[in-house]
């Protein structure tokens, strides 16, 4: 019982400390926390393929690259990570592309709770807009457009990838590719560091990818 009270007290202190921070500092701390959490998850046995040794430095680099959507890799995504590991990278790319504040507010909206003024200020800071009025509606629109484009992109990509992979594998590749393309992440999970070179003559996939990259960059 005492241990539980100590944990609750520690969590209360952390939340009280965060409340005193500026929106920009909270966003920076949020990115740092997501990157560190991502690195730890990528080092877990369920994330790394058998026989692959992933150092903390390489896991941290991969997580940072995914969250900051730079596209730089030090290990091949498909050859090094399991389906769960690739799912972690996909989530990191999505969070990095949308932004910590937008994801946080989106979760609050999904939970049916009221979005606080501080949360609105964080979104204002992250999206670089002049007013925090209409922030909830803006986040809803951003999330809807993002998920809409990614869903359509994944569906079209599946039409291409299902010819070369099993249905389940093709679904995984399609979702990963669509999210990575829309967020301009530069990651691929086709293996062998080939990226989309094997599909350089596939007009449908190339046009779809181009549209995702352009739409995500707007």
State each model region's role.
Residues 1-218:
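Membrane-proximal intracellular helices of multi-pass ion channels
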């Amino acid at each position: 019982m005492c241990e539980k009270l100590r944990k609750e007290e520690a969590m209360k202190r952390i939340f009280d400390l965060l409340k005193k921070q500026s929106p920009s500092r909270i966003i920076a701390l949020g990115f740092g926390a997501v990157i560190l959490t991502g690195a730890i998850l990528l080092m877990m046995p369920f994330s790394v393929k058998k026989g692959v040794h992933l150092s903390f430095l390489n896991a941290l680099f991969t997580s940072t690259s995914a969250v900051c959507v730079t596209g730089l890799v030090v290990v091949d995504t498909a050859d090094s990570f399991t389906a769960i590991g690739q799912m972690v990278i996909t989530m990191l790319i999505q969070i990095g592309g949308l932004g910590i504040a937008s994801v946080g507010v989106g979760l609050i909206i999904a939970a049916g709770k009221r979005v606080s003024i501080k949360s609105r200020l964080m979104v204002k800071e992250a999206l670089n807009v002049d007013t925090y009025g209409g922030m909830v509606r803006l986040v809803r629109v951003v999330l809807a457009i993002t998920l809409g484009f990614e869903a359509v992109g994944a569906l079209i990509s599946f039409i291409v990838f299902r010819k070369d992979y099993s249905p389940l594998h093709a679904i995984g590749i399609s979702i990963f590719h669509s999210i990575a393309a829309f967020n301009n992440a530069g990651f691929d999970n086709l293996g062998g560091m080939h990226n989309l070179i094997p599909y350089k003559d596939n007009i449908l996939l190339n046009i779809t990818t181009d549209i995702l990259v352009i739409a995500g960059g707007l």
